[in-house]
């Protein structure tokens, strides 16, 4: 009993140390008692408000499975109020000068930098990833905010003077209206920051639904945006699960939806949202291959494979979850296993941790079942992380690094996205065989080749049907001056996230044909024939 009380006290102390801003908006100190946990607020019309819902979801620390908060399933009235707030704020925000919107984002990126470690600690508490990885989560989102500050160049229109005598043609980009975002659990800061800053700097207002498992980072980001001078109503936040998703897909005032998450959810949101006339972009699942050529730099390649496969406990849509060893590279497999063995599994806030827990007990069970399927279907488990025990965190959702060899493309552990710290290894004799395996897989998020031969790298990059290719880069996530260009079954929509594509997604073109006669503007007689423009 005493140990349980001490553990609870330690957890509360850790929460209260996260951030003074969080205490005011998400983890109020006064909410702690022996019988209560803090509740996540809604953010509507510039205010953090308590939900009136009678349906709540527990938020767990994945390292302990202790409840650290409760998030509401927003009521219909609350969700309607959030959209109405966005709708009211839109005309004035869209009419705000682009330089003023840019200034809000410039202040915002500075506040994110100043509070980066606080956001990261909150991510580690709710999501489980290591503090260093959580800081990277925030930083990659911050890069998109910094890129959004270039809006004055990104939103330039086009013009063509004198298409015929005294007639000019020009176009410019305008915001859509109310846009919405549905974010996953694995990047609590980065993915929301892919969405609302890009949309808002273009003049849209935004409705955000963070993952119900990790809402805290988004709430703190909302507070920082408010402190940056964003007007009330330009960003609203609701919480929930299926009802909230359906609400976003169906509401007539929402013009566009950004989604990142699983294929099942992404396909559903794309179909339902598109059916209701909305613009939808959906980043979904992946099976990312790393092709290792025998001429690759062995030390660098092995280290990069281990980091990309097991970092964030494999809970990345760009995790390198499949290695294809070509020719003599298969001899490197024992050394790959040795490096993976040396990774330290622990709670994310513990010094020296390389990877933390999975998000839920259900996620752990699913990953272990997929590992089991490998043995049942004839694969070999070279490194087994299913029975790992982490001292002091025995109730956590931990799976250690796992390597499965002798894998065939027909096996379940290859066909399904595992989303855990599991690397499946295939072997081929030639590069062409490896390319065929990659192209036969339905996903198209990312891939990498490891080689010291430029011709080999060029052939691979040009022949694989994958949206993002790394050459000696295991996780080729583009910086935000480019766009995130996953393809095939990893993406639905026709316009990708951030970069030029992101601006295009959140804007619409207006084209104006203008004629100002050199002579008197008054026509001497009406023109009744079909205008031919160029004659």
From Swiss-Prot:
<dbReference type="InterPro" id="IPR016161">
    <property type="entry name" value="Ald_DH/histidinol_DH"/>
</dbReference>
<feature type="modified residue" description="Phosphoserine">
    <location>
        <position position="380"/>
    </location>
</feature>
<feature type="modified residue" description="N6-succinyllysine; alternate">
    <location>
        <position position="47"/>
    </location>
</feature>
<feature type="binding site">
    <location>
        <position position="212"/>
    </location>
    <ligand>
        <name>NAD(+)</name>
    </ligand>
</feature>
<feature type="active site" description="Nucleophile">
    <location>
        <position position="317"/>
    </location>
</feature>
<dbReference type="InterPro" id="IPR016162">
    <property type="entry name" value="Ald_DH_N"/>
</dbReference>
<keyword id="KW-0007">Acetylation</keyword>
<feature type="binding site">
    <location>
        <position position="209"/>
    </location>
    <ligand>
        <name>NAD(+)</name>
    </ligand>
</feature>
<keyword id="KW-0520">NAD</keyword>
<dbReference type="Pfam" id="PF00171">
    <property type="entry name" value="Aldedh"/>
</dbReference>
<keyword id="KW-0496">Mitochondrion</keyword>
<protein>
    <recommendedName>
        <fullName>Methylmalonate-semialdehyde/malonate-semialdehyde dehydrogenase [acylating], mitochondrial</fullName>
        <ecNumber>1.2.1.27</ecNumber>
    </recommendedName>
</protein>
<keyword id="KW-0597">Phosphoprotein</keyword>
<dbReference type="GO" id="GO:0006574">
    <property type="term" value="P:valine catabolic process"/>
</dbReference>
<feature type="modified residue" description="N6-succinyllysine; alternate">
    <location>
        <position position="55"/>
    </location>
</feature>
<feature type="modified residue" description="N6-acetyllysine; alternate">
    <location>
        <position position="364"/>
    </location>
</feature>
<feature type="modified residue" description="N6-succinyllysine; alternate">
    <location>
        <position position="376"/>
    </location>
</feature>
<keyword id="KW-0809">Transit peptide</keyword>
<dbReference type="GO" id="GO:0018478">
    <property type="term" value="F:malonate-semialdehyde dehydrogenase (acetylating) activity"/>
</dbReference>
<feature type="modified residue" description="N6-succinyllysine; alternate">
    <location>
        <position position="52"/>
    </location>
</feature>
<feature type="modified residue" description="N6-succinyllysine">
    <location>
        <position position="517"/>
    </location>
</feature>
<feature type="modified residue" description="N6-succinyllysine; alternate">
    <location>
        <position position="117"/>
    </location>
</feature>
<feature type="modified residue" description="N6-acetyllysine; alternate">
    <location>
        <position position="117"/>
    </location>
</feature>
<dbReference type="InterPro" id="IPR016160">
    <property type="entry name" value="Ald_DH_CS_CYS"/>
</dbReference>
<feature type="modified residue" description="N6-acetyllysine; alternate">
    <location>
        <position position="76"/>
    </location>
</feature>
<feature type="modified residue" description="N6-acetyllysine; alternate">
    <location>
        <position position="376"/>
    </location>
</feature>
<dbReference type="GO" id="GO:0005739">
    <property type="term" value="C:mitochondrion"/>
</dbReference>
<feature type="modified residue" description="Phosphoserine">
    <location>
        <position position="262"/>
    </location>
</feature>
<dbReference type="InterPro" id="IPR010061">
    <property type="entry name" value="MeMal-semiAld_DH"/>
</dbReference>
<feature type="binding site">
    <location>
        <position position="213"/>
    </location>
    <ligand>
        <name>NAD(+)</name>
    </ligand>
</feature>
<comment type="function">
    <text>Malonate and methylmalonate semialdehyde dehydrogenase involved in the catabolism of valine, thymine, and compounds catabolized by way of beta-alanine, including uracil and cytidine.</text>
</comment>
<comment type="subunit">
    <text>Homotetramer.</text>
</comment>
<feature type="binding site">
    <location>
        <position position="262"/>
    </location>
    <ligand>
        <name>NAD(+)</name>
    </ligand>
</feature>
<feature type="binding site">
    <location>
        <position position="417"/>
    </location>
    <ligand>
        <name>NAD(+)</name>
    </ligand>
</feature>
<feature type="modified residue" description="N6-acetyllysine">
    <location>
        <position position="330"/>
    </location>
</feature>
<feature type="transit peptide" description="Mitochondrion">
    <location>
        <begin position="1"/>
        <end position="32"/>
    </location>
</feature>
<feature type="modified residue" description="N6-acetyllysine">
    <location>
        <position position="87"/>
    </location>
</feature>
<dbReference type="GO" id="GO:0006210">
    <property type="term" value="P:thymine catabolic process"/>
</dbReference>
<dbReference type="GO" id="GO:0005654">
    <property type="term" value="C:nucleoplasm"/>
</dbReference>
<feature type="modified residue" description="N6-acetyllysine">
    <location>
        <position position="500"/>
    </location>
</feature>
<keyword id="KW-0560">Oxidoreductase</keyword>
<dbReference type="InterPro" id="IPR015590">
    <property type="entry name" value="Aldehyde_DH_dom"/>
</dbReference>
């Amino acid at each position: 009993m005493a140990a349980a009380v001490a553990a609870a006290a330690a957890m509360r102390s850790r929460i209260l140390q996260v951030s003074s801003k969080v205490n005011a908006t998400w983890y109020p100190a006064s909410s702690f008692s022996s019988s209560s946990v803090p509740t996540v607020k809604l953010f509507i019309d510039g205010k953090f408000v308590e939900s009136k819902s009678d349906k709540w979801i527990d938020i767990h620390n994945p390292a302990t499975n202790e409840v650290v908060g409760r998030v509401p399933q927003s009521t219909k009235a609350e969700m309607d109020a959030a959209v109405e707030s966005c709708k009211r704020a839109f005309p004035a925000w869209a009419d705000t000068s682009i330089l003023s919107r840019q200034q809000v984002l410039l202040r915002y990126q500075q506040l994110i930098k100043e509070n980066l470690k606080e956001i990261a600690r909150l991510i580690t508490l709710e999501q489980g990833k290591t503090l260093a990885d959580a800081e990277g989560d925030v930083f990659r989102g911050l890069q998109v905010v910094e890129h959004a500050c270039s809006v004055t160049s990104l939103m330039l229109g086009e013009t063509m003077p004198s298409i015929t005598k005294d007639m000019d043609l020009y176009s410019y980009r305008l915001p859509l209206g109310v846009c919405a975002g549905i974010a996953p659990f694995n990047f609590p800061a980065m993915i929301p920051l892919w969405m609302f800053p890009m949309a808002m700097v273009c003049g849209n207002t935004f409705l955000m639904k963070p993952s119900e498992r990790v809402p805290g980072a988004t709430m703190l980001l909302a507070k920082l945006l408010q402190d940056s001078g964003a007007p009330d109503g330009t960003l609203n936040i609701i919480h929930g699960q299926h009802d909230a998703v359906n609400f976003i897909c169906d509401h007539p005032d929402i013009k566009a939806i950004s989604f990142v998450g699983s294929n099942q959810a992404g396909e559903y949101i794309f179909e339902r949202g598109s059916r209701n006339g909305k613009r939808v972009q959906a980043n979904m699942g992946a099976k990312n291959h790393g092709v290792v050529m025998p001429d690759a730099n062995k030390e660098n390649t092995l280290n990069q494979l281990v980091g990309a496969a097991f970092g964030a406990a494999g809970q990345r849509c760009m995790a390198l979850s499949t290695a294809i060893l070509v020719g003599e590279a298969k001899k490197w497999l024992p050394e790959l296993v040795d490096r993976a063995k040396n990774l330290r599994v622990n709670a994310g806030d513990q010094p020296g941790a390389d990877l933390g827990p999975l998000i839920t007990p259900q996620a752990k069970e699913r990953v272990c079942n997929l590992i089991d399927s490998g043995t049942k279907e004839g694969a070999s488990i070279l490194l087994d992380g299913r029975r790992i025990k982490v001292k002091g965190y025995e109730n956590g959702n931990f799976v250690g690094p796992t390597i499965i060899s002798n894998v065939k493309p027909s096996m379940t552990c290859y066909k399904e996205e595992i989303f855990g710290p599991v690397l499946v290894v295939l072997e081929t004799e030639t590069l062409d065989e490896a390319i065929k395996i990659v192209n036969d897989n339905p996903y198209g998020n990312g891939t990498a080749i490891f080689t010291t031969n430029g011709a080999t790298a060029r052939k691979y990059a040009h022949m694989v049907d994958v949206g993002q290719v790394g050459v000696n880069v295991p996780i080729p996530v583009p910086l935000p001056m480019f766009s995130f260009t996953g393809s095939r079954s990893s993406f639905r929509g026709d316009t990708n996230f951030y970069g030029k594509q992101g601006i295009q997604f959140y804007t619409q073109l207006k084209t104006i044909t203008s004629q100002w006669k050199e002579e008197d503007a008054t026509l001497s007689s009406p023109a009744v024939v079909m205008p031919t423009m160029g004659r």
